[in-house]
Design a protein with these regions (language model features):
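Hydrophobic alpha-helical segments within soluble ligand-binding/sensing domains
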Residues: 129-171, 270-291
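Bacterial lipoprotein signal-peptidase II cleavage site
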Residues: 20-35
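An alpha-beta-alpha
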Residues: 42, 46, 60, 147-195, ...
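Extracytoplasmic "Venus flytrap"
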Residues: 39-61, 67, 74-84, 179-183, ...
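Beta-alpha junction/loop-to-helix N-cap segments that form part of ligand/metal-binding clefts
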Residues: 77-137, 231-246, 250
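Hinge/cleft segment of the Venus flytrap/periplasmic-binding protein
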Residues: 285-332
Length: 332
């Protein structure tokens, strides 16, 4: 497929860039007036570019600057490939960065392996269950020089919105990447939460974004609505998912608020920008305050945002006054 060819070429180019440039494409933080003030070198390893993960990175960088730290950011994307994430993490270790900030589960798993035997701390975000994904062994007392902020969304509350939207919704569908442990966790949690409120769940696993059209078509024949978990493969093609769902008259609810701008009907979830900011605060504790990382528990964001796409409301024939939209911010 053309997409896969482009992906492979992009991955080759990325590997070459890492080797030849030594991750030199960083951005400089705000410089303090005191010339003796330490400049920290932070490696940012992002699994793939899409609005949610981009927002986490922006939140992290913005907050580091807001706190007045001098930081050189070494910013790399793995283009969705674990092999690239491993290369990036290994290069950061070779460059002796002061801290590695990872965005998404696979990037965190790769960095965990790379920092073994070093004193380089790692802060992760955009991970749903770091214990299940074997990034940390405990959420309260972290180990291996690793801590971070999880992106777990209020699954039960999101599912209840389907029932508020239309009492006729009895089954919701989920499309997910079978190779992402983050997604496996969410699928199981969604099934459990759905059972509590009397909803059935149909799932379709994918291995490529090229599988999405068929997956949506399959879901449309088995389910009354589509629930979007925080799956990076699905998120990278979220505008396509939204378009296909609307064509099939499937109401969509997402765990990620950034998806609403791409045409998803609604979301009540965490702010990826905020978990990026919260990760920066942890990084400051480690780098500046010299807090023992083992005493910094894995954190979860308390900041939720409820957003509704007004155009999608109209296209699907819902009333703006629907109970499900109560208290929401409407976006065009």
């Amino acid at each position: 497929m053309k997409f896969n060819l482009i992906k492979k070429l992009t991955s080759v180019a990325l590997i070459a860039a890492i080797i030849l440039t030594g991750c030199a494409q960083g951005t400089q933080g705000t410089q303090g007036e005191n010339q003796d003030k330490k400049t920290f070198k932070i490696g940012i390893s992002q699994l793939i570019e899409h609005p949610a993960l981009d927002a986490s990175k922006k939140g992290f960088v913005d907050e580091m600057k807001n706190m007045g730290l001098d930081v050189e950011f070494l910013d790399q994307s793995a283009q969705g490939e674990l092999a690239n994430a491993q290369l990036i993490a290994e290069k950061f270790v070779k460059d002796d960065v002061d801290l590695i900030f990872t965005i998404a589960t696979l990037s965190a798993q790769a960095a965990k392996q790379a920092i073994k035997g070093t004193d380089i701390p790692m802060v992760f975000t955009a991970v749903t269950d770091p214990v299940f994904s074997q990034i940390v062994s405990d959420l309260n007392v972290t180990d291996n020089n690793i801590t971070g902020v999880i992106d777990a969304a209020p699954i039960k509350e999101n599912l209840e919105m389907f029932k508020e939207l239309d009492a006729g919704i009895k089954t919701v569908g989920i499309i997910y990447n079978v190779g992402e442990s983050n997604s496996e966790v969410q699928v199981e949690r969604t099934k459990a939460a759905a059972a509590e409120i009397g909803l059935a769940v149909e799932t379709v696993g994918i291995t490529s974004v090229n599988d999405i059209p068929q997956a949506v078509d399959t879901i449309s024949k088995k389910a009354d609505g589509l629930y979007i978990i925080t799956d990076n493969m699905v998120a990278s093609a979220i505008s396509l998912v939204a378009k296909l769902a609307k064509e099939n008259k499937l109401p969509t609810v997402s765990a990620d608020g950034t998806h609403v701008a791409e045409g998803i009907l609604m979301s009540e979830g965490i702010s990826f920008y905020e978990i990026g900011r919260e990760s920066a605060m942890i990084a400051k504790q480690i780098l500046v305050d010299k807090t023992d990382i083992a005493k910094i528990p894995v954190q979860s964001s308390k900041s939720l945002e409820k957003i509704v796409n007004l155009k999608t409301v109209e296209e699907l024939g819902f009333n703006k006054d629907n109970q499900a939209f109560k208290g929401a911010e409407f976006a065009e």
